[in-house]
């Protein structure tokens, strides 16, 4: 996780996406759960302003306690990041007849899907489940939360997606080649 002032941008979705492409959605879900666990522990042990959305042990602004909804925000998107990109990748591979260029493009799009899913779903869940607390934290009216959430999606989400589009195929192609070579031996 990379701290960016008010929130923490993540790069942990990248190994989760690569892992799901190589190992399949079951192991991808496990990797995603580990991503969620790292997020939970990081936000609990070294809290930032928005950590209440990722750890039920951090008090929600304006209250003395955390919320179990933080576990939904922390784990559900991350588990899905370990599942959905595999289906995107496999679907695109079938559509493009599994040639080498298609593999790189499929990995890039799968990487983008994982990044977009993570940022989009996390911020959507914050909006729908913790909108009032987010408004309190930001010092904005509740009706301004949608714009604030879209700003995060538009900044962090774009950066995280760009990294995934570049790194998932760059690393994934090498690891997939090694996996194929080892399975032939």
PLM feature spans:
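Loop-helix junctions at membrane interfaces
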Residues: 1-185
